[in-house]
């Protein structure tokens, strides 16, 4: 278990909006982070790929009650490491959550505590229901078609509420 990277007063002030972390959540974050790291290693070394997109469809607050980082924050830290080494690529972290309060928390964490140093990272936030978000074709075209056949995209839908996701939206 890692030490919280945000001040205790920030955690305390937002504790009612944060989730308890279950054992399977720890494993999920670990597995997704390891997968993303391997994906980034491969895609950032493919000359033709210029645009690397990670989309977290239900990002939550970015932190848990115990102070551990959520998936989107872990991915952002990986993006920062890879973006500093691969300045010819653009890294887009697209995060969505239905709760404006949780988006406020994750945005504050990103802006105040993560310490992104790479200038080739874009962070885009959306406040939508997961199905409305996934069906917003114009939005996704903007990121997926920036460089025809030159984007690598990873869409993450947390299995926590996966039963609410319309699979047909992912197929598009």
Task: State each model region's role.
Residues 18, 31-139:
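SAM cofactor-binding core of SAM-dependent methyltransferases
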Residues 6-13, 111-123, 160-165:
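Short flexible/disordered coil segments
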